[in-house]
Amino acid sequence: MKPLLELPFLSHGHATLKDVEETVRFYREFLGLDVLKTSPRTLVARLGSNTAIVGVTLGEKGLAKADRPWLRNAHFGFDFSTGDEVREAHELSFSHQDNFNIQNVGDLLEGDEGPSFMLLDQDGNYWQILENPIGGYSRFFDGECDTKHALVSFPDGKIQSQTSILKPQLMSHMTCEVIDMDKSQALYENMFGIECVRLGPKRMLGRLNSVAVIDFIETDTEIREHKMHNHIGFDVAGPEIVDAAREIIIENQERYGFEVIHKTSGSHGSYGFTFSDLDNNAWQIEDYPRGGYYWMFEQGGDLQNKFQPNIGGVDDWHKLVDPVTYEYVGVENR
């Protein structure tokens, strides 16, 4: 069945920050991510594909206002191909804990799929380090999906040589908790077009033309508020498609239990809106080129103008996009 929304790609997940400079250092020098600043208070990071982490600085006061006991269930996951590498990463995390302001290094857990452990960083975000075969969770899905835009910057499937403390091979997943897996699966498949695979009664993987997946888990968490700053995002090809998507969500608000549907706005260089679902999870649909944030990594470093290209004389990324395909081409359209 054709989904109600035509969303091309799992673009990003959000993380909140206290200090962007310290977080850049942690992401780049410890975790081994490809990271750049998009403004004095924001960053974007990736590893192994173009599904990105978007970091936004709220500061200590802003973070203190939000009671978010669910953050552990909104973690990002990074893969090593062997258990020995995970065990070594666990030891290295203790060795460098103070240098990178890591709040906690969790116990090393030996599970059926291999060892794993959790890190709690200075910003209160959680990171899972785990053993996973090359390709991440793709082995659980039938057949291939269209990863053209997910891997447009990775033609040989390899990442750049890492000089970081940890050297994971892939950001394989972001985690999202739900209340009722059956109801949530119907929403994700029928509305968003996410390809879902159940791993058990209370666990499900979802992908959308992506290498990275969403790892859905059913929980009994009582407090589920303050999730807008930790939303998951999709990109579409133009403002008019953003508007059309919002109308479809409004039309299906009662059917699928959408709680809050925000008005569209222009922020961080794009036009889009956020909304929350029946599980109080937050989502974003925004106008961005095919492949999402990957064009930012084509700019040769941190963005000199907030959320805009470093190419001289170009003040809007739309000028560097093919108007027909919405592909980033890197030269100004005239």
Regions found by a protein language model. Name each.
Residues 1-21, 76, 134-185, 232, ...:
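N-terminal beta-strand motif that seeds the catalytic metal site of vicinal oxygen chelate
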Residues 1-2, 60-66, 160-163, 217-223:
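Short beta-strand/turn micro-motifs at beta-sheet edges
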Residues 5, 14-61, 175-218:
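Core segments of cupin and vicinal oxygen chelate
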Residues 6-16, 25-28, 34-115, 233, ...:
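Ordered, small/hydrophobic-rich secondary-structure cores
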Residues 17-21, 76-123, 178-182, 233-282, ...:
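Vicinal oxygen chelate
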Residues 57-58, 110, 129-136, 217-220, ...:
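Short beta->alpha transition motifs characteristic of CBS
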